[in-house]
Protein backbone atom coordinates (compact mmCIF):
# COMPACT_ATOMS: atom_id res chain seq x y z
CA UNK A 1 0.00 0.00 0.00
CA UNK A 2 1.27 3.40 -0.94
CA UNK A 3 1.67 5.94 1.73
CA UNK A 4 -0.14 9.24 1.10
CA UNK A 5 2.10 12.29 1.06
CA UNK A 6 1.11 15.81 2.08
CA UNK A 7 1.36 16.96 -1.55
CA UNK A 8 -1.17 14.40 -2.73
CA UNK A 9 -3.72 15.48 -0.12
CA UNK A 10 -3.41 19.17 -1.09
CA UNK A 11 -3.50 18.63 -4.84
CA UNK A 12 -6.70 20.67 -5.47
CA UNK A 13 -6.12 23.38 -2.88
CA UNK A 14 -4.71 25.89 -5.36
CA UNK A 15 -7.66 25.45 -7.71
CA UNK A 16 -10.16 25.95 -4.87
CA UNK A 17 -8.38 29.10 -3.67
CA UNK A 18 -8.30 30.45 -7.22
CA UNK A 19 -12.01 29.71 -7.69
CA UNK A 20 -12.83 31.53 -4.45
CA UNK A 21 -10.76 34.65 -5.13
CA UNK A 22 -11.43 35.05 -8.87
CA UNK A 23 -14.95 36.58 -8.53
CA UNK A 24 -13.68 39.14 -6.02
CA UNK A 25 -10.76 40.09 -8.25
CA UNK A 26 -13.00 40.35 -11.33
CA UNK A 27 -15.45 42.62 -9.51
CA UNK A 28 -12.58 44.81 -8.36
CA UNK A 29 -11.17 45.11 -11.89
CA UNK A 30 -14.61 45.80 -13.40
CA UNK A 31 -15.28 48.43 -10.73
CA UNK A 32 -12.04 50.21 -11.56
CA UNK A 33 -12.94 50.12 -15.27
CA UNK A 34 -16.41 51.58 -14.59
CA UNK A 35 -14.87 54.31 -12.45
CA UNK A 36 -12.54 55.11 -15.35
CA UNK A 37 -15.51 55.45 -17.70
CA UNK A 38 -17.26 57.83 -15.27
CA UNK A 39 -14.07 59.90 -14.94
CA UNK A 40 -13.76 60.03 -18.75
CA UNK A 41 -17.34 61.33 -18.99
CA UNK A 42 -16.52 64.00 -16.39
CA UNK A 43 -13.47 65.14 -18.37
CA UNK A 44 -15.54 65.32 -21.58
CA UNK A 45 -18.24 67.32 -19.78
CA UNK A 46 -15.66 69.75 -18.38
CA UNK A 47 -14.09 70.20 -21.82
CA UNK A 48 -17.53 70.82 -23.34
CA UNK A 49 -18.43 73.55 -20.82
CA UNK A 50 -15.02 75.15 -21.37
CA UNK A 51 -15.55 75.11 -25.15
CA UNK A 52 -19.01 76.62 -24.75
CA UNK A 53 -17.76 79.42 -22.50
CA UNK A 54 -14.84 80.22 -24.80
CA UNK A 55 -17.20 80.23 -27.77
CA UNK A 56 -19.79 82.46 -26.08
CA UNK A 57 -17.55 85.05 -24.42
CA UNK A 58 -16.40 86.85 -27.59
CA UNK A 59 -19.61 86.08 -29.52
CA UNK A 60 -20.97 89.21 -31.18
CA UNK A 61 -24.62 88.62 -31.79
CA UNK A 62 -25.88 92.01 -32.86
CA UNK A 63 -29.32 91.58 -34.26
CA UNK A 64 -31.62 88.62 -33.99
CA UNK A 65 -29.51 85.66 -32.86
CA UNK A 66 -29.87 84.08 -29.42
CA UNK A 67 -26.48 83.73 -27.73
CA UNK A 68 -27.75 81.28 -25.12
CA UNK A 69 -29.00 78.82 -27.76
CA UNK A 70 -25.70 79.06 -29.64
CA UNK A 71 -23.68 78.34 -26.48
CA UNK A 72 -25.95 75.39 -25.55
CA UNK A 73 -25.55 73.98 -29.07
CA UNK A 74 -21.76 74.37 -28.85
CA UNK A 75 -21.62 72.55 -25.49
CA UNK A 76 -23.72 69.65 -26.78
CA UNK A 77 -21.66 69.43 -29.98
CA UNK A 78 -18.40 69.47 -27.99
CA UNK A 79 -19.54 66.56 -25.82
CA UNK A 80 -19.32 64.24 -28.81
CA UNK A 81 -19.01 60.92 -26.95
CA UNK A 82 -21.82 61.71 -24.51
CA UNK A 83 -25.52 61.31 -25.25
CA UNK A 84 -26.39 64.92 -26.14
CA UNK A 85 -30.04 64.40 -25.19
CA UNK A 86 -28.96 63.73 -21.59
CA UNK A 87 -26.55 66.68 -21.33
CA UNK A 88 -28.38 69.37 -19.35
CA UNK A 89 -26.85 72.80 -20.05
CA UNK A 90 -27.53 76.12 -18.34
CA UNK A 91 -26.08 79.46 -19.42
CA UNK A 92 -26.10 82.50 -17.13
CA UNK A 93 -25.02 85.94 -18.34
CA UNK A 94 -26.23 89.48 -18.90
CA UNK A 95 -24.08 89.53 -22.07
CA UNK A 96 -22.71 92.97 -21.18
CA UNK A 97 -18.98 93.47 -21.82
CA UNK A 98 -16.96 92.87 -18.66
CA UNK A 99 -19.55 90.63 -16.99
CA UNK A 100 -19.26 86.91 -16.42
CA UNK A 101 -20.62 84.17 -18.64
CA UNK A 102 -21.25 81.01 -16.62
CA UNK A 103 -21.81 77.74 -18.49
CA UNK A 104 -22.86 74.72 -16.40
CA UNK A 105 -23.67 71.22 -17.56
CA UNK A 106 -24.72 67.99 -15.89
CA UNK A 107 -24.76 64.41 -17.14
CA UNK A 108 -26.18 61.32 -15.40
CA UNK A 109 -23.93 58.38 -14.61
CA UNK A 110 -24.32 54.93 -13.09
CA UNK A 111 -21.60 52.51 -12.06
CA UNK A 112 -22.82 48.97 -12.83
CA UNK A 113 -21.23 45.74 -11.68
CA UNK A 114 -22.70 42.55 -13.12
CA UNK A 115 -26.05 44.21 -13.75
CA UNK A 116 -26.30 45.82 -10.31
CA UNK A 117 -26.18 49.61 -9.96
CA UNK A 118 -23.53 50.26 -7.33
CA UNK A 119 -23.54 54.05 -7.54
CA UNK A 120 -25.45 56.62 -9.56
CA UNK A 121 -25.86 60.36 -9.68
CA UNK A 122 -24.92 63.19 -11.97
CA UNK A 123 -21.63 64.65 -13.07
CA UNK A 124 -21.55 68.45 -12.89
CA UNK A 125 -19.18 70.97 -14.40
CA UNK A 126 -19.20 74.78 -14.58
CA UNK A 127 -16.93 77.21 -16.42
CA UNK A 128 -16.86 81.00 -16.09
CA UNK A 129 -15.47 83.39 -18.72
CA UNK A 130 -15.46 87.17 -19.01
CA UNK A 131 -17.70 88.54 -21.80
CA UNK A 132 -15.79 90.66 -24.32
Protein language model features and the residues they cover:
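Solvent-exposed, flexible loop/coil residues
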Residues: 22, 39, 43, 59, ...
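Low-complexity, S/T/G/P-rich flexible repeat/linker segments used as non-globular hinges
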Residues: 106-132
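Alpha-helical assembly-interface signal, strongest on the long, hydrophobic N-terminal helix that forms
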Residues: 2-73
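Generic marker of residues within folded, mature protein domains
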Residues: 25-27, 95, 117
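Intrinsic-disorder/low-complexity peptide segments enriched for small residues
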Residues: 5, 28, 33, 80, ...
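Short amphipathic secondary-structure patches
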Residues: 47, 51-106
Amino acid sequence: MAKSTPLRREHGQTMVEFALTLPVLLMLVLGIAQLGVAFNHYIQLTDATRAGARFGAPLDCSGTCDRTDKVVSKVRASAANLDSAQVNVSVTSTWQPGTDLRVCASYPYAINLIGLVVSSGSLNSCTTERVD
